[in-house]
Amino acid sequence: MDQVMAWVEPGKQFAKDSIRLVKRCTKPDRKEFQKIAVATAIGFAIMGFIGFFVKLIHIPINNIIVGS
């Protein structure tokens, strides 16, 4: 019986901790959500521009190398 409890107890503890975590978590309010969304959009835009300019620079360099 002790061996069974040794296997069951970690699962029970994990379930208890998980339930406590979910109860403690709260959804962000509108202001916080908009702040996160704007920051994410700015990050996407910056990464897009970086990728665009890298591609813009590498196309002529690639044409010079391959065109020779």
Curated annotation (Swiss-Prot):
Residues 62-68 are extracellular. The chain crosses the membrane at residues 33-61. It is found in: Endoplasmic reticulum membrane. Residues 1-32 are cytoplasmic. The keyword Transport applies. GO terms for molecular function: protein transmembrane transporter activity; ribosome binding. It is a single-pass membrane protein. InterPro entries: Prot_translocase_SecE_dom_sf, Translocase_Sec61-g, Translocase_SecE/Sec61-g. GO terms for cellular component: Ssh1 translocon complex. One of its GO terms (biological process) is post-translational protein targeting to membrane, translocation. Keywords: Endoplasmic reticulum, Membrane, Protein transport, Translocation, Transmembrane, Transmembrane helix, Transport. Heterotrimeric complex composed of SEC61-alpha, SEC61-beta and SEC61-gamma. Component of the ribosome-associated ER translocon complex. Belongs to the SecE/SEC61-gamma family. Necessary for protein translocation in the endoplasmic reticulum and multi-pass membrane protein biogenesis. This is Protein transport protein Sec61 subunit gamma. It comes from Ciona intestinalis (Transparent sea squirt). The lineage of its organism: Eukaryota, Metazoa, Chordata, Tunicata, Ascidiacea.
